Amino acid sequence: MINVYFSDNSCKQFLPGIKGSDIITHLFPELLNKAIAIKINDKSLDLSTEITEDCKFEVITLDSDEGLDIIRHDTAHIMAQAIKEMFPEVKTVVGPTIKDGFYYDFSTDHIFSSNELEKIEEKMREIIKKNESFIREVWTREEAIRFFSNKGEDYKVKIIAKIPIHENITVYKQGSFIDLCRGPHAPSTKISKAFKLTKVSGSYWEGNTNNAQLQRIYGTAWRTEEELKLYLNNLIEVEKRDHRKIGKELELFHIQNEALGQIFWHEKGLIIYRIIENYIRKKLENNGYIEVKTPYLLSKTLWEQSGHWDKFREHMFLSEIDNKVVAIKPMNCPCHVQIFNSKIRSYKDLPLRMAEFGTCHRYESSGALHGLMRVRSFTQDDAHIFCTEDQIIEEALKFCNLLMEVYEVFGFKDILVKFSDRPEKRAGSDKIWDKAEEALKASVKAANLNYVLNPGDGAFYGPKLEFTLKDAIGREWQCGTLQMDFVLPERLGAYYTGSDGKKHHPIMLHRAILGTIERFIGILIEHHSGKLPIWLAPVQLSILTITEDAIDYAISLKHKAMKQNIRAEVDITNEKINYKIRSHISKKIPVLWIIGKKEIETESVSIRYLESKDQHIMSSDKALKTLLSCASI
């Protein structure tokens, strides 16, 4: 008999060879219609898996995240089968699951078009309707290579060659289709009913642009048609909010091939950038930070000393000057340690909070670049706090409170915190790890934030907090970080003289609130759908004239507003007023003042707000006072 242990710590005995599905039938009949796979000793396996030794047993159900991932994995296989039946000459490559869906890469001379996706979906539904079983088989390496070679599936042969010798080669069959796969899969194709193929794009074998180009078909799959419909509607909303589209429409920025991964900020976009930068600068100043500026180009020797050369070299932009290798900095932290080291420090100088709006450069493949969200050149709202062990708790608390104040101002109130504690391999003593971890927990608790534990995911040099924002349509964006560092100050020879007269290495807290200004602006644009708060809008007020007689009055109002630091513009064109209103609404201008004969006579303005179709008249002085009350923070 074998002992099978369950999540409630109970244990049952069974004959060796019992299938996972049989255990569910005997002990969990209420899960029969929900079970999609099982876990044996934390490894996900098919329901049909035979259990031959003592183990821990769990059921994976359709309503779990893992269950949904299996549905998507199944659907990727079904799509590959459909395409092989429709286009026999196509070679299959890989088909993993991703966030909200899946994709499959194919090698073929046939160019897939978006118009073909519906036909592929129809073929997939035929396969699903047949309720074909997913059958797992274990093959020898020789059998697998021979089979896929005979089928002309060159990429599968390449994948097999990279599988370690000691690992089994497993394949899955459904109908006439056989694919190299570790699994697990559902019992049959019938579960994958709610799906949609979403787009076609190019890709490269192993993600390397020097390799053969492939075609990638993306899809999404869900448990029910209702979930699918909700997701697809959300996709439409995401497309409407795309910061690249809005950024172009509002003339905020652009990107071009001659400077991939770098932003051309236009006048209005730079206004937003500077408002954010100056707001953060003022908050830092009020919270005891000093601001510094460090070089962009630094010698290879500094990156070797810091440890970044070994771990980060492939992401650096390198050059050679005077026969010496230099790198454009990918991060600011080693530079800040140099400033710390520039003079003798005492414990009385700590904590030292050092901030920089540091422009950094990191290599990202062209395929990974995405508007403002993923770039090669970016500016961090970076700061490093040099402190003693005894100051960690207070500094972490202050940072959490500052971060929450900033997020609320920008319209984010739903914040998820992830706490990553000590990994197995780490630097520093258990005592300092205990103190650091307790400090982070205490800071989150004091800020009235709940956290999710990310066990063992801290860096080898210290634990960390990650702060994730939830936007208006429920998407999550990781922005803020607080990272303890016990190692870099020691590597770079940073020390202070303690009250005992001895030298001590400071603790270094790496921290950021926005992450990068570029990405944060992209998030803001999508969160607000381009309709930024009045204080952040590049143009806060547009004054529109109905007749030529109103031009002088409109211009005088503009000057009056600008003297009060209102960002105002005036439209004195000959267009009809309704056209002007539509035009300025499309530019997301938060406040419109409309000026006609009546307004001139009464020294008033007719006000229309971006989110309202109503107009109301107010004296120009009162209208300006009202605008001033919300035009800055």
From Swiss-Prot:
Belongs to the class-II aminoacyl-tRNA synthetase family. This is Threonine--tRNA ligase. Residues 1-61 form the TGS domain. Catalyzes the attachment of threonine to tRNA(Thr) in a two-step reaction: L-threonine is first activated by ATP to form Thr-AMP and then transferred to the acceptor end of tRNA(Thr). Also edits incorrectly charged L-seryl-tRNA(Thr). The keyword Lipoprotein does not apply. One of its GO terms (molecular function) is threonine-tRNA ligase activity. Its cofactor is Zn(2+).
